[in-house]
Design a protein with these regions (language model features):
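Coil-to-beta-strand transition motifs
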Residues: 72-75, 136-138, 149-156
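Bacterial signal peptide processing site
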Residues: 24-26
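Secretory pathway targeting signatures of secreted, lumenal, and periplasmic proteins
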Residues: 42, 46-88
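Predominantly extracellular/luminal regions of secreted and cell-surface proteins
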Residues: 34-43
């Protein structure tokens, strides 16, 4: 006859597994600095970081990125440093055009946006896009800029790609963007 300890082992193992799962949330929000210009972003998971050249108009611009994927969506912030407000305006126009071009035939809505401490020129802009293909991932983008002490401008693109499993995750991400 089995001992009472062995009869309860499967139940204890199941309870332990449930307890561990409860300690591992899908959205584990954390503050993450982006670049060296002071932006802090809330990301729902441990970020990966990368650098790459991004063609913006006739220029190839170095872009730093931090982002992660969890709960059915990718959350990312990209950063580029422009030398002047005029260059920042040109780059942001090119960045927006390149993004719209990549989205192809998606239904897009672009509108002015607001972000505390973002500069007015280039102005913050929000883009929401839903590709026409059934099941295709929606895209939410916010572009904004910040003046630097040396006269340059930091440009940012914050993106949520996909449909997060938590309905408030995209709002938490965008509301968690903090400029110094």
């Amino acid at each position: 006859m089995p001992s009472s300890d062995s009869r309860f082992r499967p139940a204890l193992a199941a309870a332990a597994a449930l307890a561990l799962a409860a300690c591992s949330p899908t959205f584990n929000w954390r503050e993450v600095p982006v670049a060296d210009d002071g932006l802090v972003v809330l990301l729902p998971c441990k970020p990966d970081r990368a650098n790459r050249a991004l063609p913006l108009g006739v220029e190839s611009v170095q872009v730093d990125m931090a982002g992660c994927e969890t709960g059915g969506a990718t959350f990312a912030v990209a950063h580029a440093s422009a030398e002047s407000p005029a260059q920042a305006e040109a780059w942001l126009r090119a960045w927006r055009a390149a993004t719209r071009s990549q989205l192809g035939e998606a239904q897009m809505t672009e509108a002015p946006a607001a972000l505390k401490r973002a500069i007015a020129a280039p102005a913050p802009v929000r883009l929401d896009a839903q590709p026409p293909q059934k099941g295709a991932a929606p895209v939410q983008v916010l572009w904004f800029a910040q003046s630097k002490k040396n006269g340059g401008v930091s440009l940012y693109q914050a993106t949520v790609l996909g449909r997060p499993s938590a309905p408030d995750a995209a709002d938490t991400f965008f509301e968690g963007l903090r400029l110094p």
